[in-house]
């Protein structure tokens, strides 16, 4: 019998490239290689966790517990967020200057959490701080805020979430690697497990026989608080572990958007429809301003004063939706020909100009509304949003027009303007501004809403109590009665200490 005849059907050749079918050797089809996941969807890391990572995660958990358990923004919240930024620099050893600057900016926003009391500030400050430390971790090895597109922003966000999920398993590696100490402790653990039921029975019998001994076994523990503390420590530790693992992840290269593109005709039609609607709106504003729309307003039972003071929130929504549409279509529309590209730029720039007109109309209407009904935080922030979105539209106009075409700067520039505005707001103290605007309005018109002013946070108390020279005695008495109902003493838990609340209590003691 020949060697080939002795082979079993289905046997592979020594080199693994042929298979015996009983008659002849047939080539084996190569096994298709599994597709490689993109770097932004992988869990690959460049460094192992050290004991410094374990210590940082534990400390972050303990500090977060102190911040959470007081239930208020204060020193504990500032320290928790600042520690995330410091650990990113000194434990993860962020190499790039930009990453360290972003972590430093997060620490600055963290400081405001114990200096301002307004929820209109502290929540955005917290969000800004967390976004900054996450961005700093993503840029720890590669990348820059000055050259990042929409697709790469989304990819880096997804990449960070993956590593935050896997952070705990990565951070405990130094502990699980200690096999020898655990092996020697195993007999002790088994002995304690065996002794536990015996000890419980004996201790219970002795406690029932001797009240003095029973008093030794009385343990005053708040198990609810204990569970809450354990949960808070766990949350803080997981956040820190995920942040450090994200900084140790394999660096991401440039991420571009999908290759699919919308046809140029479709994109141009969308922009043309938008421009037509906005042009009609601009015509309506011109008609209303000349008084030619009087019959229409009377038929709708709306006075011109009411008309001029209405609709500002809807107009801001229109501006926001238009911004999203322009950004999206400027990225996905196929503009392969010079003529279609010029047409797209013309229509997009026209839409931006008309949208800026809408923003101006919204801001004007809001100003008229404030003159009639006073200032609130929502109205102030609506003004600020209108101003910021106008700046973003100007940036988008420059981007669509081809300014710095070789760099993807629009996303980073937009983020920087938002952070800069929030930082300015922290220094300006918006609740104090609202209080001052309402005091000035009361001095000139006699109209005052003391109940709304009483609902402002400690950021506004000093301004309100210092308004005596500007107001009539009756008006100041209304403000004083409303504001002085707050606490005049301030002795919080150190983790809850807030400078604005401390200054508010001091102002009440001096004036009330």
Residue ranges of model-derived segments:
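Juxtamembrane membrane-water interface segments of multi-pass membrane proteins
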Residues: 33-50, 68, 89-100, 145-148, ...
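Short aromatic-rich membrane-water interface segments that cap or initiate transmembrane helices
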Residues: 218-232, 299-320, 375-387
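Extracytosolic and intramembrane catalytic regions of membrane-associated proteins
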Residues: 454-512
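N-terminal signal-anchor module of multipass membrane proteins
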Residues: 21, 31-92
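Signature of WW domains and closely related Tyr/Trp-rich beta-sheet microdomains
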Residues: 1-33
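Hydrophobic alpha-helical transmembrane segments in integral membrane proteins
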Residues: 405-407, 422-447
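Transmembrane-helix bundle segments that line or gate the permeation/cavity pathway
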Residues: 64-212, 228-250
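Hydrophobic membrane-spanning alpha-helices of multi-pass integral membrane proteins
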Residues: 83-86, 100-111, 194-203, 274-279, ...
